[in-house]
Structures are given as structure tokens and as C-alpha cells.
From Swiss-Prot:
Its EC number is 3.6.1.-, 3.6.1.22. PROSITE patterns: NUDIX. It comes from Pectobacterium atrosepticum (strain SCRI 1043 / ATCC BAA-672). This is NAD-capped RNA hydrolase NudC. One of its GO terms (cellular component) is cytosol.
Amino acid sequence: MEQTLKGDETGWWVVSDAVQIWMPQGELPRGTATEWSLQGKTARQIGEWQGQPAWLVCQGRDTDMASVRQLLDQDVGLFQLAGRGVQLAEFYRSHRFCGYCGHEMVRSKTELACLCHHCKERYYPQIAPCIIVAIRRGEEILLAQHNRHRGNMYTVLAGFVEVGETLEQTVVREVMEESQIQIKNLRYVSSQPWPFPHSLMMAFMADYAGGDIKHDPKELRDAGWFRYDQLPQLPPPGTVARRLIEDTVVLCRAYHENEG
């Protein structure tokens, strides 16, 4: 429930606007509302971390606004909590007016929703389901350079679920569209909220079944098979992509040792 801060409230402070968060000194603020000059602001508690509440304040600051990605290197759990705040702040920012009748909406006091008192429509935060998949061929893993990524990082294949698709169908389609290969033995591994801006990554592993790699230049700069002990630059620890790669490397190494 939203409340006006008196000043003595304490905890972690997710001050967010336009998919960015306030990171003074490169860290998420922690302490009382008064310490961070937040008294009088409207806030909502969005969870807890290390025994202290986490508060969302939907407002930008003139300085020290940064991407929530910075928290990945500090603490994965804190990154996930701050990412929740970023997604909620963006939801509120993009749902000021009703999409049906155009009237101004208000935030629900009892749930995470926006309400239109004119036509009685109710809106909830949108989540975009995505798949991400690691594919193994013997002692090798398929890795690719995505056009949307900077630098020389290689990672596994990923894509959005389309209307009417199952997750399994999405994996097969995305792999075919991006690499032109077939897969088998598809199995679910894990999931990770990804606040860029509001995705939910659902991770899979699969085995190579056939075909030659022909990467889609609209999506990928490069794609290829990499031996488990000759890997390129990888995604940072804490990402589900890195976990998939590390888990697949274990299988690749076991395959090499058994075949050797």
C-alpha cells in the first residue's frame, strides 16, 4: 500500500524513473527516508532484503541515475528486488491513462494495479515471457554474438514467446530462425525475472539433433560451436545465461572424459 514518507521509515530505497534507478556512490541507498531526503515522497513497500524493507519511490533524480544492471556485480538477490521496483515504476509511468476510454487512472491501494474509475477497467503489470536455451553437441556448446549486445560477449540463444505458442514450441522456432539447426531432449532448467524492461526468462537445455549453423544476420553477428575449454567472453555471473553455459560445460566435460 502506498504511503507518504514521514522520514523515520528505514530500509532499501529503489528510486526509479524511465527504467533507471538512483545509485548514489554506485550503490542502492540504504537507511532512513530522512537520510536520503525522501520525506514527503510517496512510496510503496515492494519486498524485503536482509531483514529490512525495500521501498519503491517512482521519481527520478538529477544525478546518479543508472541502470539496474550495475547491481548484478554486487548482489544477484538485490538486483532481482531492485528490478522488481524498476518494472513497477515503468508500469505506473506507462499506464497513466486508460487504453480503452483515455481517462486518467489511479493506482490501486490494495494491489499492484492501475484503475480507471470512468470505465472500471483494471490494468496489471505486463510480463513478456522469453525463452533462453543452451544447446550441446558432444563436448561443444552453441554460442552466439547478438546484435543487441555490445563488445565481444557470446551467449546462448533467446527469444520472445509469441501468441498461441507453448514454451517448447518457442524454443524450437527460435533455434531454427536464428541458427537453422534442429534440437532434441529439451528440458526446463530455471527462470529469472529480467527488468529490461519487463521480461521473464525461462531457461532450457537441449541437445543437437541435426543441421548446419546459418545464423540470422538480423539477430546475430556470429554463431558457432565452442569446445568447453575454449570459450569466448561470456555473460556475467548471476545471469541465467551464465548458469546455462556453466551447467552445459559440465556436461561437455563429462562427455569428453567418457569418450576419452
